[in-house]
Amino acid sequence: MLSPKRTKFRRHHRGRMKGKANRGNSIVYGDFGLQALEPGWIKSRQIESGRRVLTRYVRRNGKLWVCLFPDKPVTMRAAESRMGSGKGMPEYWVAVVKPGKILYELTGLTETVARKALRITGHKMPVKTQIVINKKF
């Protein structure tokens, strides 16, 4: 699973997800991409499961880029613990995603295979997604 090697602070605020993605909202590397349509948190396990699906389809003749990284810790307290006595320990890591953010990029595949792979990956994501194709392709 993806997680930062070290962070400046151990625990984060939850924050707000308002607005659209103004960076990372267009295909840069590949020919096909998976784009988020709604805001949400994507866990590192979900990113990894999507990457595995795409790697299976890409094999040796294509290339895959994962365009998001889980850099926000989500804390949880122990079950049945009393209120107070501080914030819980970091349980897992999430990537904050805004509408328009490109999640994965692919190249070196036919359009039908790429669409099939990205559709399966989109179903594994906790946010609605759409498949986008690079204009120069």
From Swiss-Prot:
UniProt superkingdom: Eukaryota
Name by which UniProt lists this protein: Large ribosomal subunit protein uL16c
Main localisation: plastid
Oligomeric and partner information: Part of the 50S ribosomal subunit.
Gene encoding the protein: rpl16
Keywords: Chloroplast, Plastid, Ribonucleoprotein, Ribosomal protein
Gene3D superfamilies per the UniProt record, alphabetical: Ribosomal protein L10e/L16
Protein family according to the UniProt entry: Belongs to the universal ribosomal protein uL16 family.
This protein's GO CC annotations: chloroplast; mitochondrial large ribosomal subunit
Region annotated Disordered, chain positions: 1-21
